[in-house]
Amino acid sequence: MTFTELSTDLLADPVALLMSSFFTASNSSKAAGQAYIERLKLRVTDRDAPVSMMAAGAQLAAIREWGSISSADRYATLPRIHQRILIVHGSKDIVVIPINAFLLAQHLPDAQLVMYPDASHGAQSQHAEVFLQHARLFLDG
């Protein structure tokens, strides 16, 4: 399934949408998704504001604009970024397909790509413990 193939029924149910777009259909991924949902419920103070429809629309517009730029132009300025960058991605991401993470890593001179197996758009939540290890190694390096 791709992100654009998600049904309108899922769009009406935020938890179902999150589970379908951030986690895969495997039992281990579904279990990680449920654990993530439970972790979200634990924090009751100092929570981020929910994403507004306006913010979601602006993000989709930015994605569309990025996609309308020719491939050559899309990556032209990335080699000028010399900041260390950690790219975290799921091997089965349906929101941003994995090849895009590889392309990004190829065009950024100091990027490190970590691809998590059997993970969709919520790779860092599905593999939370190992992600924290990778993040610490990156930040300490």
Regions found by a protein language model. Name each.
Residues 1-13:
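Flexible "cap/lid" loop of the alpha/beta hydrolase fold
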Residues 16-61, 67, 71:
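Conserved alpha/beta-hydrolase catalytic His-Asp/Glu region
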Residues 17, 39, 58-62, 76, ...:
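Alpha-helical elements of Rossmann-like donor-binding domains used by nucleotide-donor carbohydrate transfer enzymes
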Residues 72-80:
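The feature captures the conserved acid-bearing segment of alpha/beta-hydrolase catalytic domains
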Residues 81, 87-89, 93:
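Short beta-strand/loop motif that positions the catalytic acidic residue
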Residues 82-83, 110:
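Active-site acidic short loop of glycosyltransferases
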Residues 94-100:
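Conserved alpha/beta-hydrolase "acid-adjacent" motif
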Residues 102, 108-141:
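Catalytic active-site module of serine/aspartate enzymes centered on a nucleophile-bearing elbow/loop
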